[in-house]
């Protein structure tokens, strides 16, 4: 994962209205049957589907920090998953968690959590993951007129001071792919990394590409995307988080697989995250 901030909000809202409405409508009149014996099936609340997102949920994943609207890539996807599981929109309940708390060992107050979590073997020791629903590229964000301007390859990045959110795939990618001359500065949130960039404490930070588009278009004045980073052996596939050994893992994975097979997942992705074309990959 990387977080917060994709495409301009105005364009996103206009492009995705149909998808959001469609996802909610499908959930409201699901062809699936009502979940049977919800308590026995492992749901937190019988007859309800409890979904978690971040303490603050960011665009383009959730619009206006309101996941119940179904607007945003992960909000729309959550309702599409709910529909596949047999839940109407009104039977979906949202809760909030911090990023780290959701992947810590122990019981959960949610049935699943959708918050741009990268699937890793280390995290699998504490929680379950669904089938992946998105593969995210990592991007370098910097200020115009700063040390990163004019950089067009990996060698040009090495002399920069980088920042990233602690524990994120972005931080791992910096060290594994860029291998900068200085130690990567780690922050508790992407907001802190942005503040450090604005203060001149770092030259650039790395974040997932959809978030980079939103950051540069709305949140960081005079900023730009330097380019995408090659994978370098680090996969950044996002999965839904569930409690370890959850009885719901198989059914949630099956729902995502069905959404991929019937084209719904691609439709939602295209509507909300279609700004990723045209950014060069730095080699």
Task: Label every model-predicted segment.
Residues 1-16:
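Bacterial N-terminal signal peptides that target proteins for export
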Residues 30, 75, 80-85, 168, ...:
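Extended ligand-binding regions for polar small-molecule ligands
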Residues 56-58, 70-84, 118, 139-192, ...:
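Bilobed "Venus flytrap"/periplasmic-binding protein-like clamshell domains
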Residues 92-154:
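Acidic, polar ligand-binding/catalytic clefts
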Residues 101, 117-126, 175-176, 198, ...:
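A ligand-binding cleft/hinge motif common to bilobed small-molecule-binding domains
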């Amino acid at each position: 994962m990387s977080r917060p901030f994709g495409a301009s909000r105005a364009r996103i809202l206009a492009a995705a209205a149909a998808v959001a409405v469609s996802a909610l409508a499908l959930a409201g009149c699901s062809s699936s049957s009502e979940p049977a014996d919800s308590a026995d099936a492992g749901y937190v609340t019988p007859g309800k589907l409890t979904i978690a997102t971040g303490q603050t949920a960011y665009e383009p994943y959730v619009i206006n920090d309101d996941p119940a609207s179904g607007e945003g890539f992960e909000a729309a996807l959550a309702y599409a998953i709910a529909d596949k599981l047999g839940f109407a929109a009104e039977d979906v309940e949202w809760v909030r968690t911090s990023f780290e708390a959701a992947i810590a060992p122990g019981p959960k107050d949610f049935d699943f959590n959708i918050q741009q979590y990268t699937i890793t073997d280390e995290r699998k020791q504490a929680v379950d993951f669904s089938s992946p629903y998105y593969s995210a590229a990592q991007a370098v964000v910097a200020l115009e007129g700063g040390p990163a301007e004019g950089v067009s390859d990996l060698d040009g990045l090495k002399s920069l001071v980088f920042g990233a959110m602690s524990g994120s795939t972005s931080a791992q990618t910096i060290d594994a792919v860029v291998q900068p001359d200085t130690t990567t500065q780690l922050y508790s949130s992407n907001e802190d990394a942005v503040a450090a960039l604005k203060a001149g404490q770092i030259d650039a930070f790395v974040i997932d590409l959809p978030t980079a588009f939103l950051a540069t278009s709305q949140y960081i004045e005079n900023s730009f995307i330097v380019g995408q980073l090659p994978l370098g052996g680090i996969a950044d596939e996002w999965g839904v988080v569930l409690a370890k050994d959850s009885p719901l893992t198989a059914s949630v994975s099956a729902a995502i697989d069905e959404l991929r097979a019937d084209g719904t997942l691609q439709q939602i992705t295209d509507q909300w995250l279609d700004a990723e074309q045209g950014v060069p990959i730095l080699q």
